[in-house]
Amino acid sequence: MSKNKQDAGLSTSAGLVRYMDEDASKIKIAPEKVLGITISIMVLLFILNYGLLA
């Protein structure tokens, strides 16, 4: 009886692994670009909040 329970767990795990392998996002952005955009927005907000341009 424990053999049947163990088989069910393995097939469930295998299905989850297959789902994660097939799940691909259509938007692909390099991590460097995400960091660059984030830092740019932070600098822009800092400049706008503290008025360093004038």
UniProtKB/Swiss-Prot annotation:
- Is the keyword Acetylation assigned to this protein? no
| Cellular localization per UniProt | Cell membrane
Tell me if Cell membrane is a UniProt keyword of this record: yes
Protein name stated in the entry: Preprotein translocase subunit SecG
Share what the entry says about its subunit structure, partners included. Answer: Component of the protein translocase complex. Heterotrimer consisting of alpha (SecY), beta (SecG) and gamma (SecE) subunits. Can form oligomers of the heterotrimer.
Q: Which family does it belong to?
A: Belongs to the SEC61-beta family.
- The scientific name of the source species is Methanococcus aeolicus (strain ATCC BAA-1280 / DSM 17508 / OCM 812 / Nankai-3)
A Pfam family that the UniProt record links to this protein: Sec61_beta
Q: Gene for this protein? A: secG
Q: What is its main location?
A: membrane
